[in-house]
Regions:
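Extended, low-polarity segments enriched in aliphatic/aromatic residues
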Residues: 2-46, 51-61, 67-68, 72-79, ...
């Protein structure tokens, strides 16, 4: 049976159609009220992105959802997890740094009007096991224990491309976004018994080049970064003691992308499918009936919000999608992105990508060219949703209702009445005419196009 996906496009002709309030109406249409009881704890799962990336979820969008939950008499809480320990540095790998980043992006208790849980602890070691009974690859994953305290979960996602997941949406925001550190490693196959990190092989040629750099150099960083002392320089060679490796993943990205170590291609090619497996495990553990999904298809970039930068949007803004089915809501976004025109000059404005229905994220986002349909098909296989959907175009909220949220006065108590004494005491005398009757610059000179560009140059030319 086809799942319902509720949708509103990117246009706005009055306040009720503004982006923050689209999700409010769509959540109502999708039946959020039936999922929320007064006094319940409602988790709002977000991903704020890394510092430097501004094509991410807006605080205003999330705040509107927070206020809708509060109007229902429930207790909203923003929930997020720390980044996996898979690099020497990073914005969100420990709670202190993560909170610093979300503050920079406008997410804190004051701006959101509710608590923010960065689940759980500095490195999310307090987690629970989530069985994946029908996983394509995974047998189980892990989610922070604090997630089990939630009565309802609104998963709010920015839809975009992804280097490893091929695309990021609702499924990934659970499969990775609600996984603990161990869960994230499992999803990336980093602790796989055959293909995991301990199977990595040192590229000695690259290592020798790196060791020639002045100290402290990259090799020093890799050695110091391993909490289990797996790396060393012995007899002039860079050595990986795999028998010491505990698959913590701290070395993965720096050694992979630098070419210092070679890992099985399976680590990359299985990621989208494992994301869906992990999503299924976490949803089954917490209760599938607790979930509802909001996908914002705006600022659709070729790469993920995990990056500390963002490229130009590859597709024009499409709109807001809401469903109780994570597979269907992602499928609706994928098909809308496949049907849309691409933005001129963007990464997708290229042969093989610009044409509709060309599997754009497969060929334009995924590092390993993994199909964008893997998450969808694996989600169906895991029983968390359906790829077939009915797209229901919703009607906006009334401008009157939205206005009542924006301002705390109305026609019965207008601002002139409320602040009568203060207004009457204000000094309105302009101390003479503020303008002349005839313009000093004739109208024909005001409207003509002025001289513009004289020369194109680069900063290197000046240097």
């Amino acid at each position: 049976m086809a799942s319902k996906v509720y949708y509103m496009n990117d246009r706005a002709t009055h306040g009720g159609e503004s982006v923050p309030f689209k999700a409010v109406k769509l959540l109502r249409d999708a039946g959020l009220k039936d999922m929320v009881k007064p006094g319940a704890t409602v988790g709002i799962k977000i991903h704020t992105g890394n510092y430097g990336n501004s094509a991410t979820l807006r605080p205003q969008w999330v705040r509107a959802i927070v206020e809708e939950v509060q109007r229902m008499g429930a207790n909203p809480v923003i929930v997020e997890t720390n980044l996996n320990i898979n690099a020497m540095g990073g914005d969100r790998q420990d709670t202190k740094q993560h909170r610093k980043i979300i503050n920079r992006h406008g997410f804190n208790e004051q701006t959101m009007g509710c608590p923010i849980w960065l689940c759980e602890g500095p490195f999310e070691f307090d987690d629970v096991k989530c069985e994946v009974p029908h996983g394509v690859y995974l047998n189980h994953t892990f989610t922070p224990r604090r997630m089990t305290k939630l009565d309802t979960i609104i998963v709010v996602s920015h839809f975009k491309g992804h280097l490893q997941g091929t695309y990021g949406g609702a499924i990934k925001n659970i499969g990775i976004g609600m996984a603990s550190n161990r869960g994230k490693s499992a999803t990336h196959f980093l602790n796989h018994p055959e293909f995991g990190l301990h199977s990595g092989v040192v590229n000695q040629e690259v290592a020798q080049q790196m060791m020639q750099a002045p100290h402290p150099n990259f090799i020093d960083g890799i050695i110091n970064n391993c909490a289990f002392d797996c790396f060393a320089v012995e007899d002039g060679e860079f050595v990986f003691h795999r028998e010491k490796c505990k698959d913590c993943s701290a070395c993965y990205y720096p050694t992979l992308f630098s070419g210092l170590m070679q890992f099985s291609n399976t680590l990359m090619t299985t990621t989208p499918t494992c994301i869906a497996d992990s999503c299924a495990g976490i949803m089954n553990k917490l209760g599938k009936e607790k979930f509802i999904f909001v996908n914002y298809a705006y600022d659709i970039t070729p790469s993920c919000d995990c990056d500390n930068k963002h490229d130009a949007a590859v597709i024009p803004n499409i709109g807001t999608f809401v469903s109780k089915d994570p597979v269907a809501v992602d499928m609706a976004c994928l098909e809308a992105c496949e049907a849309a025109s691409v933005n001129p000059g963007s990464a997708f404005d290229a042969p093989g990508l610009a044409e509709p229905n060309s599997d754009r994220f497969t060929h334009g986002s995924s590092l390993a060219q993994v199909s964008q349909w893997c998450q969808i098909n694996s989600g169906v296989f895991n029983g968390i949703g359906e790829s077939e959907y009915e797209l229901v175009e919703s009607e906006p909220l009334s401008e009157a209702e939205v206005s009542s949220w924006i301002q705390d006065y109305d026609f019965t108590n207008p601002i002139g009445k409320r602040y009568r004494d203060q207004i009457r005491a204000f000094h309105f005398d302009t101390e003479g005419p503020t303008a002349v009757s005839e313009p000093r610059l004739p109208l024909e000179d005001q409207i003509k196009r002025p001289a513009g560009l004289v020369k194109n140059s680069k900063i290197s030319d000046e240097q």
